[in-house]
Every structure is written in structure tokens, then in C-alpha cells.
Amino acid sequence: MLTITSYFGFLLAALTITSALLIGLNKIRLI
């Protein structure tokens, strides 16, 4: 149970960081 929770937490963090980087790159390109 604990491993599944930590896995989902890590996956959520990875998705958040990836989306943040993509949004940042798009903003830099637009400027």
C-alpha cells in the first residue's frame, strides 16, 4: 500500500514538473 502511494506521488510530481517545463518553453517561444 505504501509503495503504491509513493509511486503515484512520484508519478504526479514527474507529470507536474514536465507540464511546468513545457509551459515555460512555450511562453519563452511566444515572447
From Swiss-Prot:
UniProt cross-references to PANTHER family, sorted A to Z: CYTOCHROME B6-F COMPLEX SUBUNIT 6
- GO MF term set: electron transporter, transferring electrons within cytochrome b6/f complex of photosystem II activity
- Name by which UniProt lists this protein: Cytochrome b6-f complex subunit 6
- Give an example GO biological process: photosynthesis
Tell me, in one coarse class, where this protein mainly resides.
plastid
Keywords for this entry?
A: Chloroplast, Electron transport, Membrane, Photosynthesis, Plastid, Thylakoid, Transmembrane, Transmembrane helix, Transport
Classification via HAMAP family: Cytb6_f_PetL (MF_00433)
Q: What is the organism field in this record?
A: Amborella trichopoda
Q: Which Pfam family, any one of them, does this sequence belong to?
A: PetL
- So where does this one cross the membrane? 4-26
Which family does the record assign? Belongs to the PetL family.
The stretch of residues making up the signal peptide is none
Q: What is any one of the record's Gene Ontology cellular component terms?
A: chloroplast thylakoid membrane
Q: Where in the cell is it found?
A: Plastid, Chloroplast thylakoid membrane
Q: What does this protein do?
A: Component of the cytochrome b6-f complex, which mediates electron transfer between photosystem II (PSII) and photosystem I (PSI), cyclic electron flow around PSI, and state transitions. PetL is important for photoautotrophic growth as well as for electron transfer efficiency and stability of the cytochrome b6-f complex.
What does the subunit comment say?
Answer: The 4 large subunits of the cytochrome b6-f complex are cytochrome b6, subunit IV (17 kDa polypeptide, PetD), cytochrome f and the Rieske protein, while the 4 small subunits are PetG, PetL, PetM and PetN. The complex functions as a dimer.
